[in-house]
Amino acid sequence: MMLSRAKPAVGRGVQPTDKKKKKGRKIPKLEELLSKRDFTGAITLLEFKRHVGEEEEDTNLWIGYCAFHLGDYKRALEEYENATKEENCNSEVWVNLACTYFFLGMYKQAEAAGFKASKSRLQNRLLFHLAHKFNDEKKLMSFHQNLQDVTEDQLSLASIHYMRSHYQEAIDIYKRILLDNREYLALNVYVALCYYKLDYYDVSQEVLAVYLQQIPDSTIALNLKACNHFRLYNGRAAEAELKSLMDNASSSFEFAKELIRHNLVVFRGGEGALQVLPPLVDVIPEARLNLVIYYLRQDDVQEAYNLIKDLEPTTPQEYILKGVVNAALGQEMGSRDHMKIAQQFFQLVGGSASECDTIPGRQCMASCFFLLKQFDDVLIYLNSFKSYFYNDDIFNFNYAQAKAATGNTSEGEEAFLLIQSEKMKNDYIYLSWLARCYIMNKKPRLAWELYLKMETSGESFSLLQLIANDCYKMGQFYYSAKAFDVLERLDPNPEYWEGKRGACVGIFQMIVAGREPKETLREVLHLLRSTGNTQVEYMIRIMKKWAKENRVPI
């Protein structure tokens, strides 16, 4: 939800005016326009005077100042650069130039210009923010110590807290300033944004309402309101909130259009992602992350990895996403290195003081222990927020696996059956774990039916092996024999005949003991006859003899 800092918010063209309306109207003074924050009018006046030869002192600096406040940073840059080339250039020009470089994302140039300026609170604030951009903790602390207890410096400190994910610290500063300056309405938006980042979406809405009562058409506030609706309700509700913005966003607010296009992709579940997000990757920070998420949802793990591999994570969200991508790539490639990186990222977030008691933090710890195959620990964390994810397919998928892995196949089966996603239900991991749960819960027929619904493939062959072996271990010899029979026909491996022979003997013993219907013997004989092994005739002869003695029709 950051603004575009690389594109001018206002073009250079002066809007044509009606000369008749202007006739007789007094030309306003520059001071009047600046006091009203009419920067467009001020630039128009300054350019007019420049054109007719009535240029005032420092005209280029005033044009640069107005362009900067309109978001036309390229125009401001041009004016300030020209000013620095003049003789006896005021040293304050350098700090203004540095601020312009900063908003254009040209941080090295901003630092160089900043050090040419005379020492001032503005210079210190600028260098403070640049130290954050460069991840230079030593310089950051040095400039931090120079901050004073004045509004501008405290707002700068709050901004750094926000960017370092220290949202509560930022809120404390904003609230303290608001106590003495109720007229600083925009601070309510900053407070609301911090609460949004802390996942307190309802509180964010309440704080935001204070600002929207006074400024109902604010682009940033309406966008944040839409984001809150997305989190509290759904994408449709969020999109409805953005409608007025889409209708009213003027050409002078290009960043608003970029922001709206980006958020609509998110609200619509990724629709149009490949058309909208790539050009915004270096404009809106979240665009890269959301494009990575899109690729993951499309199972294009390699593209997701290519997009995020060079990103140096600084926020919990970035650490989490890098962890997810590395885990997915590790599973796809069978790479232990990627799995270890993922586990470390998850542990870093889940173990941090700021995230350990949040749901994302606990999800990270669950993921960390999942990768370490410590499923008892996985369940401790999953159970701590289970009530929030009752109908969430991904949660139920992980919860079911953890339950089954710890031997609680009854609850594992129950969780697997809650899953609604057809894509997930056709995944081999889902099918194999559910089959195992069915077998352990003495429902081998349901496991066999899972196999029958599958098309012939390597995965169906693997499921057959699982059914054959697990049913054998559980004494469910009938379905074990059926599975080994199919395996033997698909691959004449002696091991499959041995498994089938043992399963058939097991069924026969259960029939003799009265624990299996006598009618099953007919099918056992049919399974044995499909094998060309020399041992078959001896086994069939014994079974037939018993059937004859016990009057069992075969």
UniProtKB/Swiss-Prot annotation:
Residue ranges of TPR repeats: 57-90, 92-125, 151-184, 468-501
Protein name: Intraflagellar transport protein 56
PANTHER family linked to this entry: INTRAFLAGELLAR TRANSPORT PROTEIN 56
Region described as Disordered: spans on this chain: 1-26
Subcellular location: Cell projection, Cilium
InterPro entries per record: TPR-like_helical_dom_sf, TPR_rpt, TTC26
Gene Ontology cellular-component annotations: centrosome; ciliary basal body; ciliary base; cilium; intraciliary transport particle B; neuron projection
BP term (GO), one: intraciliary anterograde transport
Organism: Macaca fascicularis (Crab-eating macaque)
Keywords for this protein: Cell projection, Cilium, Protein transport, Repeat, TPR repeat, Transport
Family: Belongs to the IFT56 family.
Quaternary data: Component of the IFT complex B. Interacts with IFT46; the interaction is direct.
GO terms assigned for molecular function: intraciliary transport particle B binding
Job of this protein: Component of the intraflagellar transport (IFT) complex B required for transport of proteins in the motile cilium. Required for transport of specific ciliary cargo proteins related to motility, while it is neither required for IFT complex B assembly or motion nor for cilium assembly. Required for efficient coupling between the accumulation of GLI2 and GLI3 at the ciliary tips and their dissociation from the negative regulator SUFU. Plays a key role in maintaining the integrity of the IFT complex B and the proper ciliary localization of the IFT complex B components.
